[in-house]
Curated annotation (Swiss-Prot):
GO CC, one annotated term: extracellular space
Disulfide bonds: C28-C134, C61-C185
Organism: Rattus norvegicus (Rat)
Family: Belongs to the calycin superfamily. Lipocalin family.
Protein's name according to its UniProt entry: Apolipoprotein D
């Protein structure tokens, strides 16, 4: 009984103190991903336009660059401007985990951490991309991660509305999505 109370108290703490994270009961949903995904067209620079806030991204002006590695995997370079004005960057590696669904990638930033799902739900390769990730904990709750990316620092409102519709039509909660201001950001990729 004491163990159950401790577990419930811990879970309650997670749900109430994790700023921005999107915790939900049940396992991760499995939304459809981009059909006929072409990773080579996806390579290059992307700007973070909107996202569900995550504990590992605290800065602004977030940009990502994807490039092909010699081993066939994808180098991921994320950069952000910290609140104190310094530049923070993290480098990782992504790979296609299932060639029958090439838009389902796994990304790993630190060797001691397991790879995380990185699913491209939608992209036109030239202007927008919708990325979804989810982690299930203890088989009965999950955390959603969402990124709306643009090839330019701005996306038209109708594009953002369309991408949010994809999320909601797949039972992915968008209530905590925030807009990331890319105005007056340095070009650091």
């Amino acid at each position: 009984m004491a163990t159950m109370l401790l577990l419930l108290a811990t879970l309650a703490g997670l749900f109430t103190t994790t700023e921005g994270q999107s915790f939900h009961l049940g396992k991760c949903p499995s939304p459809p991903v981009q059909e006929n995904f072409d990773v080579k067209k996806y390579l290059g620079r992307w700007y973070e336009i909107e996202k569900i806030p995550v504990s590992f991204e605290k800065g602004n002006c977030i940009q990502a660059n994807y490039s092909l590695m010699e081993n066939g995997n994808i180098k991921v370079l994320n950069k952000e401007l910290r609140p104190d004005g310094t530049l923070n960057q993290v480098e990782g590696e992504a790979k296609q985990s299932n060639m029958s669904e090439p838009a389902k990638l796994e990304v790993q930033f630190f060797s001691l951490m397991p790879p995380a799902p990185y699913w491209i739900l939608a992209t036109d390769y030239e202007s927008y991309a919708l990325v979804y990730s989810c982690t299930t904990f203890f088989w009965f709750f999950h955390v959603d991660y969402v990124w709306i990316l643009g090839r330019n620092p701005y996306l038209p409102p109708e594009t953002i509305t369309y991408l949010k519709y994809i999320l909601t039509s797949n039972d992915i909660d968008i209530a905590k999505i925030t807009t990331k201001d890319q105005a007056n950001c340095p070009d650091f990729l």
